[in-house]
Amino acid sequence: MCIRDRADWVAEFNATIAGSVQSLRTNELNPWVIMLTSLGNPTSVIIMVILIASLLGFLRHWDDDIFFTGNLIGAVVLVQVLKLCYTIERPTENLLIARPESFSFPSAHSACCLIMCCLVALLIIRALRAHQLSVGLEVLTWIVFIAIGLSIGISRIYVGVHWPTDVLGGWLIAATWLFPTITWYLSQYPRSRFGLPHAQHEEYPVLP
């Protein structure tokens, strides 16, 4: 009985939230949300990771490069393993895009895009601090990138390919993943190397 009640509660929650989000659909808004959700597609993410990793490598910021790339690879692997563990099927109705073949929970778009946005924001903020720019600009950077990451998650509900609990699960995974990894990274590399002359880079440790 307890399991059945819990399943009913989750189903009701998913139906209520999905209905509310999808009630916002309009012919004008739909193409924009579809474009937004496509930013989290594997091809888009791979291209962005390659570009950012290449830039960090070009600047010879190997510690930042390994931290950024390793974080995302680890997160992708974790999400895919969890999908195979839970084997929850995706929604089949009210779809605006093709239904992916993979399992539904947790949402890879929600988890990985939020992780990537937070990591990019962190790297940008460390660069800003190296140039002693305002705290207000740092706060704005966090707000913008977190909003983008969350918006991609919500877009998955909007286009109908994920349950709301999938998205919430993805966000929870992102937060659980980011807290220890960022804490460790900042403890190992407390000062940013962005903006420093090349000769000064040797003063800072790099990952083996």
What residue ranges belong to the model's regions?
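Alpha-helical transmembrane segments of multi-pass membrane proteins, especially transporters
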Residues: 19, 67-72, 167-171
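N-terminal transmembrane-helix/juxtamembrane module of multi-pass inner/ER membrane proteins
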Residues: 3-44, 84-97
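Membrane-interface loops
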Residues: 12-15, 48-49, 55-135, 206
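Short hydrophobic alpha-helical membrane-embedded segments
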Residues: 41-47, 142-146
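Hydrophobic, membrane-inserted alpha-helices
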Residues: 31, 47-54, 149-153
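Residue-level signal for helical boundary/lining positions with a hydrophobic bias
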Residues: 36-37, 83, 105, 162
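Membrane-embedded catalytic cores of phosphoryl/pyrophosphoryl-handling enzymes
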Residues: 95-208
